Amino acid sequence: MVKLHIGIDDTDSPKGMCTTYLGALLYREISKIAEPLDLPKLIRLNPNVPYKTRGNGAVAMSFDAREEDILKIKNLVLEMVKKLSEFSHQNTNPGVVFIEGDIPEKLERFAYKAIWEHLNITDAENIAEELNAEIHKFRLGRGIIGALAAIGHPLKVFTYELLAYRTREFWGTARKVNKESVFAVDHLTYPFTYDNVDLSKGSVLITPHGKDPVLVGIRGIDKNKVIWAFENITFEEPIDFFQIYKTNQNTDDHLRFKKIAELKPLDSAIVRGKVIKKYWEKGRHVFFEISDDTGKLRVAAFEPTKGFRKYVRMLIEGDEIIAAGGVKEFNGVLTLNLEKFYPIKLTEKITYEKPKCPKCKGTMKSKGEYLKCKKCGYKMKKVLIPKRIPRDLKRKIYEVPPDARKHLSRPLVLPMAENKILDVLKLKR
């Protein structure tokens, strides 16, 4: 028997299709002639790259196969990619990768680079040649980047997603899922399944909005709870089939600590800094600035984050925070698109008030360098009393709402969700 690893990416487009659908079909077919080593993998890559379709996800799967079946399996994969990829869209550039034997450790490092950085096709071709990986490019073949990364990702931390697919005649039509049943299931399975609904808006989150074949995607950390949730939701249209993926979704895979001067466009990062410019608003987006010992950075809570912006507005100059998110150019300025933040130290907020009249307790009013009582006319030298105003921010992590959350960002309700933020506190400054 031979270990055969298969990676696929960039088969979809905004018009339709889904790489997970193609991957699920292949996993079912190949499992008839080879032994799966695990569930298929869904690996989310750098969420900031400009040419992603939707979630920038690649798929991979591994089998024990007989030597005589290897060519048959490879041909099946290539034929299905040719048949089902969205070649009508100019930005669809599929890539397929085959690796036999053990997965090289170097490919694991490549996988994380594909999540943290912006890689190009040459980077993928070079590592493929070095590792003797078999690559197949369709058109530009950009998909080989994700295909290699999906094979190489070790999924040391992972979640599950159950994806149910629609019958073809329903593709492109409104999805029919009973809303009340989704809320009921969420109530019974949360937090072992999560991001099913947005309670603050009363909306369902498991149904995508595009023309792709996915009816629902149910995420969770307990595979059995995910299956139970699926079985207890009421669907008002037929389901073709479903597939469970192991995935790096909601693992914070994309976040690494960086100094501000080290940041580049398309990075995802955690930074630590002091607020040097209080918030301002433009087009319903909320901005502020922080600095560390290497430079300053604009930070943004964009309009889709809704109520999260309320907490951003509570920050004032002098506050020290840890902030996490994606880095991009916005109106020509390098900007951190905020996903979560943690106030480490809150500066004191002080106001100064006039004292009461010492004679009659009346209200004093300012008269140049003096205060004069409105009631009895008593005068005294102006002395204002400092008063500390309580800060509404707590020393805790604040995160964007579920419908604004990136695929890789870990909800605070999950185990280890605070680790990457709090680990920054352990670093020497």
Curated annotation (Swiss-Prot):
<dbReference type="InterPro" id="IPR055394">
    <property type="entry name" value="Zn_ribbon_TiaS"/>
</dbReference>
<dbReference type="InterPro" id="IPR012340">
    <property type="entry name" value="NA-bd_OB-fold"/>
</dbReference>
<keyword id="KW-0067">ATP-binding</keyword>
<dbReference type="Pfam" id="PF23783">
    <property type="entry name" value="Zn_ribbon_TiaS"/>
</dbReference>
<keyword id="KW-0819">tRNA processing</keyword>
<keyword id="KW-0436">Ligase</keyword>
<comment type="similarity">
    <text>Belongs to the TiaS family.</text>
</comment>
<dbReference type="InterPro" id="IPR053434">
    <property type="entry name" value="TiaS"/>
</dbReference>
<dbReference type="Pfam" id="PF01336">
    <property type="entry name" value="tRNA_anti-codon"/>
</dbReference>
<keyword id="KW-0547">Nucleotide-binding</keyword>
<comment type="function">
    <text>ATP-dependent agmatine transferase that catalyzes the formation of 2-agmatinylcytidine (agm2C) at the wobble position (C34) of tRNA(Ile2), converting the codon specificity from AUG to AUA.</text>
</comment>
<keyword id="KW-0963">Cytoplasm</keyword>
<dbReference type="GO" id="GO:0016879">
    <property type="term" value="F:ligase activity, forming carbon-nitrogen bonds"/>
</dbReference>
<dbReference type="InterPro" id="IPR004365">
    <property type="entry name" value="NA-bd_OB_tRNA"/>
</dbReference>
<dbReference type="GO" id="GO:0005524">
    <property type="term" value="F:ATP binding"/>
</dbReference>
<dbReference type="InterPro" id="IPR053870">
    <property type="entry name" value="TiaS-like_TCKD"/>
</dbReference>
<dbReference type="GO" id="GO:0002101">
    <property type="term" value="P:tRNA wobble cytosine modification"/>
</dbReference>
<dbReference type="GO" id="GO:0003676">
    <property type="term" value="F:nucleic acid binding"/>
</dbReference>
<dbReference type="InterPro" id="IPR013696">
    <property type="entry name" value="TiaS_FLD"/>
</dbReference>
<dbReference type="Pfam" id="PF22641">
    <property type="entry name" value="TiaS_TCKD"/>
</dbReference>
<protein>
    <recommendedName>
        <fullName>tRNA(Ile2) 2-agmatinylcytidine synthetase TiaS</fullName>
        <ecNumber>6.3.4.22</ecNumber>
    </recommendedName>
</protein>
<dbReference type="Pfam" id="PF08489">
    <property type="entry name" value="TiaS_FLD"/>
</dbReference>
<dbReference type="GO" id="GO:0005737">
    <property type="term" value="C:cytoplasm"/>
</dbReference>
<feature type="DNA-binding region" description="OB">
    <location>
        <begin position="271"/>
        <end position="343"/>
    </location>
</feature>
<dbReference type="InterPro" id="IPR024913">
    <property type="entry name" value="tRNA_Ile2__agm2C_synt"/>
</dbReference>
